[in-house]
Amino acid sequence: MNTIGMDPSGLILDGLTQAIPEAAIGWDMPASSTMPRVRLALDRAAYQTPVSQYMRLRASVYAPQGDGRTCDWPKALALSETICRWLLDNRRKRPLIDASVESGPLQTHDDDLRQDFAYTVILLTVEAA
């Protein structure tokens, strides 16, 4: 069987952009120095069934304070929670079959950017094409 999970990236990006208008959201690091940023990454995982595939959505939320390095944790955690709620509320919208929070939000640090951020992983079940 040569199926592959359908790509939910358009649905996710469009939905989160509408749900969180106060943040810059993208699959690459959004360029913004004035608003919180959300970097998304989607990784394919095992096939749950012959007609569905797991995917992991990683959401990194950067909400820097005035110094540009320390994180506004309440803001970052609130945005992470909004991301999780949107995905759980829309987990039956095709090509999604289901979604669950696998871990997070966790407080962590980006050594390259020298910024703290909130990190969440959501396990998605996606239709196979």
Please identify what each model-predicted range represents.
Residues S33-D43:
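A short, hydrophobic beta-strand-centered structural micro-motif
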Residues M1-A23, L42-A129:
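Charged, amphipathic alpha-helical segments and their flanking helix caps
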Residues I25-T34:
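Short acidic low-complexity segments
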